[in-house]
C-alpha cells in the first residue's frame, strides 16, 4: 500500500510540476499590439499583458490548465484551426487575433452548447449580477434556442457537501475549476468527475461533506451559479452592497479581503488579490465567521451589580472606573493591562501609554508565552523572516511545534504549492497532524529536535540553498521553549545558508493578529509573577482563566463581544470590531497593513483607542492625542516601520546574525524537560470571539467535529 501511495505521489508531482523559470523573452503580436513575454507563457497571458481580455470559463491563472471550455479560442496566423489560448504557449513572432468574425462565430457556438442544458435560473440565482456565463451570454448568446430534445434538459441531483457550500448542479458547465482547486491547492481531493460527455457529473462520488478549511474558495472560482455560499443564500444582490477593501484579523496571515455591507450589516467577506500574502484565497473561517459580528455584541457600557450587569452611560461607566482606581490606588505592577488577539496597534500603544503614565509597566497579552525565549529586542527573532511568498523558494523545511493547516491555512497552501512543484522535503517535530503534504514526523519534544538537527535532517538543512525552519507560536507556551530556541539559534548561527543576503531561514509563525505589533511596541514588559494585580484592564482579552484574575481585583473589560473576558469584569466598555474601525495590524512576516471601517459599530460602542483616550481624562492622566493621526505619529515614534504600510522592514544580515547569537545567549542555561509539544489549535473553527459567536462556525463544529485529526498510529494521510 505504501509503495502504491509513493508511486501516485511521484506521478502527481510530475503532473503538477512547473518548468523552471526562463529568463528568455519572446515577442508576440496580439491584435496589432507587440508585447514581450517570458517564453513558455500562454497566449491568454500575452493577451492580458497587451491589455486584451479573452473570455474564459475554465482558465484561472492560479490553477492548472484544463482547456476544456473552448471559450478562449483565438486565431493564430499560419495555423489552420482556432487555438485554445489558455493551453497554447507563445512562440517568437507569433501573430494572434482575438476578435475576428471567425472567432465570434466559434464563441457563439460554444455559448449555445453551454446554454443548451443550462436552466433559466438567473432571477433566483445568487450568482446573478456577477456571473461569467451571464455576461458572456449577453455578448455571444442568441435571443432564442434551437434545443428541442423530447426528454428535456439535463437534470442533475444537487450534492450535499456541507454547511458552507450550496450546490445547484443543473447549472454546472464542467469547467472543473472546483476539482482542480480542491486537489491542487486545498489538498483535499474529495471533488472529482464521474461519467462522460452529457452524463458527466461533478461531486464527491460517495456522498460526503467537503472537509477542508479552504473549501469556500470554490464559490469564487465557480463561473456560474453551481456553487454558491449557503449562509449568504438569497440574502442580497451584489448591486445592493457597499464594498470595502480591508484585511482579515482572525489569524496572523493578514489576508487581504473585501467586506460587503448593506446598511450596518456585514453580508459577506470575499478575498482580494495579493500575491505576496494570500494570493486569491482565504480560509473558511475568514469567509464565513462574519455572521459572528451580529451576535453576542456589546452595545452599551455595563456595570456589575451583584451577579448581574446593569446598563450605564459612558460617563457613569468611566466615573465608576476612576472611583475604583482612586480607592485601590495600585502601586507599580499592581495595575495590569492584558491585550487580546484582535487588538489593533493604535489601541495597544494607547493602553500602554496610559498604564505607563499611571506608574506601571505591567502589560502583557492573554496567551501565556515565554517571551524571554525569543525576546523582543531583535525583530528577526519573532517574525516570519523568509516571508510568506518566500516559502515558494524553499528547498528544505522543518516544522517545529506547529500545524500550519490550522494556525495559518492560507500559508499552508503555499507549502503545499512548492511541495507539489519540486522535490521539497518536509519534516516536523511536535504533535502529529493531518497534513496536506508529505511530512516526516521526527518526534514530539525538544530532545527529538536536538537529535534531528544533529542527524540527517540537520545535514540536509545545512546543505540546502534556502532552508526553512518554522517555529510555531505554541512553542513559547511549552516548558522547553528556551531550549528549543537555543537549539534553533545554535544551528542557524553555524550554517551560513540560514542568513545569506536577503534570505533568513529562521521563522516564527504567529497565530494572533495583534502579536507582532505587541512585540514591536514592547507590550510584553516582564513583571515578577509575585506581584499581585489589584486593578486589571482587559483589552479584548478572552483567552484568560480564573487563575489569571485575583478574586479581589477590580476588572475592566473593553471589547466587542460578550465572551469569557467580559464574565470577569466589574465594568464593561463596548469597543469596535475590525470591520468597524481603521486600525493598524502587523502580520506574522512583519508586514504592516490596515483595516478600514466597512460599517459603524452597534449601539454606543466606540473605537478602542478613543475609549482609552476618554478614560485617561477621568484618571487625571490625559493622553496627548486627540485624533487617529496623532496616535499613529506616536506609533512612528516607538517603531517607525509601523507607519509604512504594505512593506516589510528589512533586517540586515549583521542584525540577523546578532539575533541568532541572542537566542543562544539568552537561553544558554536552558534545560530540556522533554515535554511533548502540542499544537496550540485543535479546533480550527473556534479560535477567537468572533468565530465563537458565529452560528455558521457552530454548524461546522457540529458537522466536522472540533478536531480534524488522524489516528496516531496511522500513516500520515497524503492528499494529492
UniProtKB/Swiss-Prot annotation:
Residues 102-141 form the 4Fe-4S His(Cys)3-ligated-type domain. GO terms for molecular function: 4 iron, 4 sulfur cluster binding; metal ion binding; NADH dehydrogenase (ubiquinone) activity. Disruption phenotype: Leads to sensitivity to both cell-wall damaging agents calcofluor white and Congo red, as well as to thermosensitivity. Also increases the sensitivity to oxidative stress agents H(2)O(2) and menadione. Impairs the yeast to hypha transition. Causes significantly less damage to host oral epithelial cells. Keywords: 4Fe-4S, Electron transport, Iron, Iron-sulfur, Metal-binding, Mitochondrion, NAD, Oxidoreductase, Respiratory chain, Transit peptide, Translocase, Transport, Ubiquinone, Virulence. Pfam families: Fer2_4 (PF13510), Fer4_NDSU1 (PF22151), Fer4_Nqo3 (PF22117), Molybdopterin (PF00384), NADH-G_4Fe-4S_3 (PF10588), NADH_dhqG_C (PF09326). GO terms for cellular component: membrane; mitochondrion. Residues 24-102 form the 2Fe-2S ferredoxin-type domain. One of its GO terms (biological process) is ATP synthesis coupled electron transport. InterPro entries: 2Fe-2S_ferredoxin-like_sf, 2Fe-2S_ferredoxin-type, Mopterin_OxRdtase, Mopterin_OxRdtase_4Fe-4S_dom, NADH_UbQ_OxRdtase_75kDa_su_CS, NADH_UbQ_OxRdtase_ferredoxin, NADH_UbQ_OxRdtase_Gsu, NADH_UbQ_OxRdtase_Gsu_4Fe4S-bd. PROSITE patterns: 2FE2S_FER_2, 4FE4S_HC3, 4FE4S_MOW_BIS_MGD, COMPLEX1_75K_1, COMPLEX1_75K_2, COMPLEX1_75K_3. Residues 1-23 form a transit peptide. It catalyses: a ubiquinone + NADH + 5 H(+)(in) = a ubiquinol + NAD(+) + 4 H(+)(out). Belongs to the complex I 75 kDa subunit family. Core subunit of respiratory chain NADH dehydrogenase (Complex I) which is composed of 45 different subunits. This is the largest subunit of complex I and it is a component of the iron-sulfur (IP) fragment of the enzyme. This is NADH-ubiquinone oxidoreductase 78 kDa subunit, mitochondrial. It comes from Candida albicans (strain SC5314 / ATCC MYA-2876).
